[in-house]
Amino acid sequence: MADTAELAIVHATTASASWLTDPTVFAANRKPAHSSHRYVIGETREPKQSLDGEWKVRIEQARNVDVESAPFAAVDFEDGDFGAIEVPGHLQMAGYLKNKYVNIQYPWDGHEDPQAPNIPENNHVAIYRRRFALDAQLARTLENDGTVSLTFHGAATAIYVWLDGTFVGYGEDGFTPSEFDVTEALRNGNGNAADSPEAEHTLTVACYEYSSASWLEDQDFWRLHGLFRTVELAAQPHTHVETVQLEADYTAADTAGTADTAELNAALTLRNPADAMTIESTLRDGDGNVVWESTQACNGEIALNSGKMTNIAPWSAESPTLYTLTVRVVGHDGAIIETVTQKIGFRTFRIENGIMTINGKRIVFKGADRHEFDAKRGRAITREDMLSDVVFCKRHNINAIRTSHYPNQEYWYDLCDEYGLYLIDETNMETHGTWVANNVERPEDGIPGSRPEWEGACVDRINSMMRRDYNHPSVLIWSLGNESSAGEVFRAMYRHAHTIDPNRPVHYEGSVHMREFEDVTDIESRMYAHADEIERYLNDGSPAHTDGPKKPYISCEYMHAMGNSCGNMDEYTALERYPMYQGGFIWDFIDQAIETKLPDGTTRMCYGGDFGDRPSDYEFSGDGLLFADRTPSPKAQEVKQLYANVKIAVSVDEARITNDNLFVSTGDYRFVLRILADGKPVWSTTRRFDVAAGESASFEVDWPVDDYRSNAEELVLEVSQQLGNACDWAPAGYELAFGQCVVAGAKTTADAVDAAGAPADGTVTLGRWNAGVRGQGREALFSRTQGGMVSYTFGEREFVLRRPSITTFRPLTDNDRGAGHAFERAAWAVAGKYARCVDCAIANRGENAVEATYTYELAIPQRTKVTVRYVADTAGLVSLDVEYPGEKNGDLPTIPAFGIEWALPVEYANLRFYGAGPEETYADRRHAKLGVWSTTAGDDCAPYLLPQETGNHEDVRWAEITDDSGHGVRVKRGAGAKPFAMSLLPYSSTMLEEALHQDELPKPRHMFLRLLAAQMGVGGDDSWMSPVHEQYQLPADQPLSLNVQLKLF
């Protein structure tokens, strides 16, 4: 298949409906792709005019729209019955089309069965119309023999464009600019713009829901359409810098005594260069100081070269230093015709000896895949959204983003340059549904494969992306697309990419499905490979090369963050010890949920299927580290600690600091050292630990543990890495990472129930139906017939609505459902819930205490017996022991959770606990800080799209559940017992299990306290197949024991 240096674009004076189903026609009259450099006319005149704002729109069926005669594009067309829509925006979000979410399958599947490149008959067209007057600045440029272009920065899926009734052009690939020259249309349209800049013009767009391009855009996202990015006019002077291509290389010194050097090479393409005399170029640092300048004669192709420069600070995510190149085009009369500015970061990114390096250092991507999404605006996100996302990344130690699976808005790249994020820039292409059906893969059937009719469109897509984004230092890797199998078309794309850019690596994961096309990627990239599978590659190589790895490895998607997920992430970060392991990208960044107002005025975060869209993949759109409203999910806590560049190991006599930064020492951070006595801070100091990048060092710490040991059950020694100074994304003192160790104290773990030590003025009553213990204003009542403690009061306050019941299950997580957990462990869903009490033994324990022991049979065929034992004394202390002996008989599945669930009055909604936090933790997601944390039952119920298991806290020593007046119950681990797991939620496990949306959960009428001996992990390898890892499961043949002390206050 032949490559073309530049893509051939159809030129036409009238529109053709045939283009919609012709993959060889992907644009008509579109200008060649070019860099997104900034420019002004002269020195200050802004060249652009925004056409954003309110447009008119009407939806038609495609069969009723004739784009060739296009009567709707006439200036005098009657559009009084059109509706209003904001641009940028989506037709679906504005209510004009139905929201549709599918993952792999195409949205028309089952309704129609078109064969590519054909499209469904049920195809909508949005006729957009907008009237505008040309800004005076742009009219002046036209008057001076300049040009004006019209750019659609994002439009889905295909657009036909008319200006004043004149056909302007056609465009696909909605995620890169469709730019059209409208100079003549403006001059010849409704009024002469040069003479009458206030003349009104009429812009008409026919935006199609489906075209042949739809086959290339089968990404896992909401299928949203319309003009969803900025629409603008831009004027260009007669002599104009059309494109800029920069190489800003940085070379680190390789021998002692030599200097680091940087060199700038820039290629500028000028239109009408004969009308200019000179090019003046200036490079300035962030303080405005000139570091290089030149003046040279003007011709068509301008080559700038700075030569070797010293004292240039390199760009990296750790230290994103930017310089500004200013280029002035000077006319023969000495006047400045145009001024171009471009931010520059000097850096070199290469694959050296099989390892990706930046500025000579091995890089590890601590990344996430990011869809552009907002719950209210869809993919029409704002600058504020983008800045919020960048700040989240920096605060959570995320250093890289893959623009999955399309080029992002241009401003995103500016932010990543400025704040420091590495990017894999991905071509707008996914054809997953063409080669996967009913979970059966047929990669040879994939589009585009080796079909020559698709080559032009696919090569054009990567060409448009690369030309636009080339100059951004944050872009380290080009990606050919996502989940589109492989074939000769990808070889053409790969060759074209390296023709434009021989330096950056090219990435593509799809070749793993067709190993004969391994040559289309410079990186071994896989999705959802388990850690052990990755390790095999790092040791042995790929199936095609079993003599060791030949390419650096990344997981372009891993840690499927759907719902309550991201367990066992540490198994992946542990692979960083292999030089050719270079990190991964968590799928994905933000939940794709649409905030929808319900008839009763409330709102719901809706997922697939909620709009009557079928087929649908329902809640599979909820895979984010952020919830759809951009609040961090509890999973982010784990990611932040595991992605930290500074690792801290604490012991009783030192702190060991490992600095995994590549370029930045730890000298500018402050390290706060604390001692916590049973979670309470009792000692603190601040130290400076200066460790060079890539190095480790141990620092002696004289912890005054002996001063606090006698009055504590345990001490926590903590070192916190914090920002020493405020920066653009966080204040001074913001914590980036921490390390802790636990030292035993001298106090006993808990006050055991002691009949001899209990007050003698209390009473113990052994009745025929109940046994009661009363003292110090507290009373506990144990039923002989109802299987447990049926009352626990302090004064007039009752804390037991129903006796605490055995639980052996948990609400299913998304990962549980995907791995078949419900089917495999269905027995445990009812084993505890429907357990029956088969024995009760109540007796005095001394004079001032009572012991009540209940034996339950679990509702499983083995009828395994579980013991629930209470010991209560007249001091108001209740000891609770719940024992599962382990069941050797039969092949029982592992247990989801084991302990008790206890319904409390609704007012007891506040939780304060000493354990791992502050966010929820699980057996395989517990890289959290040990401390005392405060929250509420409502706040602890994470708003996962599909209600599920949530709110668990591991390693809990004690917890206090209180009302707003401070009254409540304290739960503490028993004497000699291990820490327990617990949660306090406004909903029972059954309620969470049954609801399909958060708003379907009932108004809280009780609080549900769950005390657990243990709970299985949540998993995270994927959400459709992989179970929780064995070491984080609870084998049914092993005993489990919960031992806690209760006291009301």
UniProtKB/Swiss-Prot annotation:
Optimum pH is 7.0 with ONPG as substrate. Retains 60% of its activity between pH 6.0 and 8.0. Its cofactor is Mg(2+). One of its GO terms (molecular function) is carbohydrate binding. Activity is inhibited by EDTA. Activity is abolished by Cu(2+) and shows 59% reduction in the presence of Mn(2+). Lactose acts as a competitive inhibitor. Mg(2+) binds at residues 430, 432, 483. Possesses the industrially desirable properties of high substrate affinity for lactose and low product inhibition by galactose, and is an ideal candidate for dairy industry applications and prebiotic manufacture. The active site is at 483 (proton donor), 557 (nucleophile). PROSITE patterns: GLYCOSYL_HYDROL_F2_1. It catalyses: Hydrolysis of terminal non-reducing beta-D-galactose residues in beta-D-galactosides. Keywords: Glycosidase, Hydrolase, Magnesium, Metal-binding. SUPFAM superfamilies: (Trans)glycosidases, beta-Galactosidase/glucuronidase domain, Galactose mutarotase-like, Galactose-binding domain-like. This is Beta-galactosidase BgaC.
